[in-house]
């Protein structure tokens, strides 16, 4: 849901620009209080009851809309542990945290520029060698289960390349 959307044009029930800003403010407060944030180790998947999860060897969530992913991620919130789609600024921080991993990026003064994220798990048009038993044929393509592509794991986080084009809150 873009931040600049008119309150009357929102597709998520009860969504307003104010609620969007409040979510971001709450994130900033949590990061300050906790000294950081966590990111799920495995891609978002759903169990047999269609409940969202982040577990290895599961059917990953694909071909979904921003709105569905937003709602799905929220469903993982339990107690004081919150779950939400990652914000762009969090994505950027993950990439910076991984900057020393197989990179060819640029540092200018105190600024850091990611000029090629393929070394950080972003693999457009990349061939990944994997055995037949690790996949399920889906038409003319193969569907990987969560955590299957070990070569796409960096700092123990699997496949930042994306199954939902890495939707972010923005």
Which residues does each PLM region occupy?
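Short beta->alpha transition motifs characteristic of CBS
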Residues: 149, 167-170
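Short aromatic-cysteine micro-motif
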Residues: 2-160
């Amino acid at each position: 849901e873009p931040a600049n959307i008119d309150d009357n044009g929102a597709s998520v029930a009860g969504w307003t620009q104010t609620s969007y800003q409040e979510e971001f403010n709450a994130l900033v407060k949590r990061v300050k209080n906790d000294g950081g944030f966590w990111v799920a180790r495995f891609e978002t998947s759903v169990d047999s009851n269609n409940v969202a999860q982040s577990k290895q060897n599961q059917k990953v969530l694909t071909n979904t809309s921003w709105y569905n992913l937003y709602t799905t991620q929220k469903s993982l919130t339990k107690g004081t542990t919150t779950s939400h789609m990652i914000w762009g600024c969090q994505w950027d921080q993950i990439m910076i945290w991984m900057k020393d991993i197989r990179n060819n990026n640029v540092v200018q003064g105190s600024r850091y520029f990611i000029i090629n994220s393929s070394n950080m798990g972003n693999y457009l048009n990349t061939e990944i060698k994997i055995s037949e038993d690790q996949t399920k044929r889906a038409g003319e393509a193969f569907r990987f289960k969560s955590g299957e592509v070990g070569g796409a794991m960096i700092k123990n986080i699997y496949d930042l390349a994306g199954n939902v084009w890495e939707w972010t809150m923005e």
